[in-house]
Amino acid sequence: MNHIIETKDAPKPIGPYSQALKIDNFIILSGQIPIDVISNQIPENIAEQTYLVLKNIKLILVHAKFQVHNIIKTTVFTTDLKKINIINEIYKKFFIDNKSNFPARSCVEVQKLPKNVKIEIEAMAFKK
């Protein structure tokens, strides 16, 4: 059975979609962009944006009673693959800090993202 996941701890959707959808032991998160839920601001640099996106993903997962180590796949969308080393540094630290293996991942450069952000990440997680 499908269950819509919605938490005020992470930014609300900016379009007609859910933050996440839980289906049995899976959770599928919509792409998250770096909006600070308290200030409603978007950081300027790619490092801060990457960290905030991952933080928002974690907040949605925790609300749904999942953890970072349950993530099995992410897709990273960025407007500048020349910044991949910075993205990878923050991404790697996030998973290590959360005592998690690295999930499967795709990374794609796109021309533009909503609200002119530099990064968006979607995730899928599974737990027994």
Curated annotation (Swiss-Prot):
GO cellular component, one term: cytosol
Signal peptide stretch: none
InterPro entries registered for this protein in UniProt: RidA (IPR006056), RutC-like_sf (IPR035959), YjgF/YER057c/UK114 (IPR006175)
GO molecular function: deaminase activity
Highest taxon, organism lineage: Bacteria
Entries under SUPFAM superfamilies matching the protein: YjgF-like
NCBIfam families tied to this protein: Rid family detoxifying hydrolase
Family: Belongs to the RutC family.
PANTHER family: 2-IMINOBUTANOATE/2-IMINOPROPANOATE DEAMINASE RIDA (PTHR11803), 2-IMINOBUTANOATE_2-IMINOPROPANOATE DEAMINASE (PTHR11803:SF39)
Protein name: RutC family protein BU371
